[in-house]
């Protein structure tokens, strides 16, 4: 039995790749280059069944916010993406509806963005204390000299069908 265990340990030790290819850990350069973008956002929000609320006259709302993005350059076509966003909706109806988002995702070819994360808001139209939600987003960012112009589509599902959809644009610097 001892010989079998020793033989297995020897095979395991010899099979460990000591000089492995480092492509999975950042390629030839292991430097992590982070880029930061930030900017204003404005656009349209649709909150399903929001007109059932006493606070809102319509489910269609204007959105205004500020967003920060950090990308880790992947030395190729794929970058890692972190997004933080604060948005206020309902100003067109004299209502203040703030929300915050934190997402993680990918940026493809420095333009197409796909992300998922958490959404927090201070208002729950179902009155069941559902203040945290999943948020998914897809967007396109176009270079504009020293600025860039993003266009994002956001979906926030809800267990009680009070989902939200948003389309935003803005400017990054």
What are the residue ranges of the model-derived segments?
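Outer-membrane beta-barrel "beta-signal"
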Residues: 160-173
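Repeated loop/turn-to-beta-strand initiation elements of outer-membrane beta-barrel proteins
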Residues: 75-80, 110-114, 143-152
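Structural signature of outer-membrane beta-barrel channels/translocons
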Residues: 69-75, 105-109, 139-143, 156, ...
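Membrane-embedded beta-strand positions in outer-membrane beta-barrel channels/transporters
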Residues: 65-67, 101, 135-137, 166-168
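Cleavable N-terminal export/targeting peptides
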Residues: 1-29
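Membrane-embedded beta-strand positions of outer-membrane beta-barrel proteins
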Residues: 38-44, 82-84, 104, 114-116, ...
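Short glycine/proline- and aromatic-enriched beta-strand/turn motifs that initiate or cap beta-hairpins
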Residues: 20-65, 170-172
């Amino acid at each position: 039995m001892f010989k079998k265990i020793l033989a297995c340990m020897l095979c395991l030790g010899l099979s460990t790749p000591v000089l492995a290819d480092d492509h999975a850990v950042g390629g030839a350069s292991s430097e992590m280059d982070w880029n930061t973008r930030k900017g204003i956002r404005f656009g349209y929000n649709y909150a399903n069944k929001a007109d059932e609320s006493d606070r809102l006259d319509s489910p269609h709302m204007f959105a205004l916010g500020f967003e920060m993005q950090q990308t880790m350059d992947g030395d190729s076509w794929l970058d890692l993406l972190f997004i933080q966003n604060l948005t206020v909706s309902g100003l067109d109806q004299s209502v203040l509806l703030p929300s915050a988002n934190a997402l993680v995702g990918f940026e493809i070819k420095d333009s197409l963005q796909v992300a998922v994360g958490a959404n927090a808001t201070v208002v729950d139209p179902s009155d069941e204390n559902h203040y945290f939600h999943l948020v998914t987003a897809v967007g396109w960012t176009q270079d504009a000299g020293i600025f860039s112009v993003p266009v994002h589509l956001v979906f926030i599902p809800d267990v009680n069908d009070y989902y939200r959809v948003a389309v935003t644009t803005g400017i990054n610097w």
